[in-house]
Amino acid sequence: MRTDFTDDTTWAQTLAAVIASYREDTITGLTPVNDAAFDRLTLDALGELIHDQTYVFLADATTMTDPEHPLLAVDTSDESSHGNYPMLRLAPSVMAEVEVNLFLANTDFADFADTVDDDGVYRGLNR
């Protein structure tokens, strides 16, 4: 979900990198959302919008300004954590690895969070 609309070129590059991380036959639950109604969406407001979603990936201001364009992964599985969700950053190139494993429940959010690099970005297990 795009929440920063300051740079259309960076958005297009980031989305292309995300899509490229998937193989053609990959089973996924990912739906890119590019709607200016979500510009500057806060995590509190996010909680009001998502129902029955266990995770959300955001292209926020950091995504648009950091040269690596790390997306913000938000674990929304615990409704009681409204606004205080567990989060991690991930490189667009590992989106399929993270999203598909969460979608299929092969791995949980904490497993990925436990393996982020020192800068808080998950870049994959096989680097």
Residue positions per predicted region:
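Short linear, low-complexity motifs centered on an aromatic residue
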Residues: 115-127
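Short helix/strand-capping turn motifs
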Residues: 1-110, 125-126
